[in-house]
Amino acid sequence: MISPNVETFIGCDSSYRAADIVLYGAPFDSTTSYRPGARFGPSAIRHESFGLETYSPYQNADLTDFDIFDSGDLELCFGSSEAALADIEARAAEILRDGKLPLLLGGEHLVTLGAVRAVAEKHPGLHIIHFDAHADLRDDYLGAKLSHACVLRRCHEIVGDGRIHQFCIRSGERAEFEFAAQHTEMHKFDFTGLAELTEQLCATKEPVYLTIDLDCLDPSCFPGTGTPEAGGVSFLQLLDAIRTVSKANIVGADLNELAPMLDISGVSTATACKVLRELLIALDKGWPGFQVSQKII
């Protein structure tokens, strides 16, 4: 059984045995290509959370209404991406074997690959819903196949054509967009099409993995990330998207790419905390009063 963590995200005080959702951190940013620091994201979010209320006025629910366990951060090998991914995969697989939903806190976006490996093994026919400024579909980055710039390409090799659904994408090489046109479902710039996709996935009850790169947010509200891109969505747009997609059969999720030291104001860390609170509440299916259809923007 996974041991308790000393410093937990606020409101995540359930025992492991009782938990429906298990939060686990991957403080890894060894393939960062521009501005490093995402490895400090998980600890910064936990520390900052003590200035945040457990209650969400957006969803009229409280984190303490649910059974959520924070297992803390994995001790990862910074010198080997594959070793780090193997450790992430093993932790996700353990959580899944115990009948719980794994929620990974990064870290750079490459960490998603470890979790997806485990979730796809447990849930054949997996779909991936991807919120990000970047396509992350390069076949390699400077010769490296395991890079944050290639993570969705590696995920495609696991789940196959038509099962990766990308939103808010506004940056990438021409080759990435050409690849997407043939192999993924890409929705550029915003969340247009998400509601329709969610309805389809609800009808089929197919398993879904949700991966959120926080640089989908506009740098005006979230500058503390390794590769900021102008033209992003707002916090409220992201929250509405999370609430929408949570209607689907979500079997795993992650939130990544906060680099807290790149925003000395602390605004980015505070925003990431709030996104995580809303994500945890939205994913927990135990609250019967939650109505995703209620718009907040």
Task: Locate each region found by the language model.
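Conserved alpha-helical scaffold segments that buttress catalytic/binding sites
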Residues: 1-297
